[in-house]
């Protein structure tokens, strides 16, 4: 039997890659259709009007407008208020 363990002495020295989660556009900022509003794990913030949800729970704008955050029934919601511009 060996008196000492072989090679690799340290079990540490690993780290995962950063995921860059969080709010990307804050309230009052303008969003284009398709722009990412929030990157998250799980639905910490729920989609409101004109906001879609990706398979990784990313929230994105479905229409151009101004981003608004509100709380309703104990849930945080993010919506995009569409601006009606006269053409």
Curated annotation (Swiss-Prot):
MF terms (GO), sorted A to Z: structural constituent of ribosome
Source superkingdom: Bacteria
Chain positions covered by the region annotation Disordered: 1-20
SUPFAM superfamilies given in the database record: Ribosomal L27 protein-like
GO CC terms: cytosolic large ribosomal subunit
GO biological process: translation
InterPro entries assigned: Ribosomal_bL27 (IPR001684), Ribosomal_bL27_CS (IPR018261)
Family: Belongs to the bacterial ribosomal protein bL27 family.
NCBIfam families: L27
Protein name: Large ribosomal subunit protein bL27
Source organism of the structure: Treponema pallidum (strain Nichols)
Lineage: Bacteria, Pseudomonadati, Spirochaetota, Spirochaetia, Spirochaetales
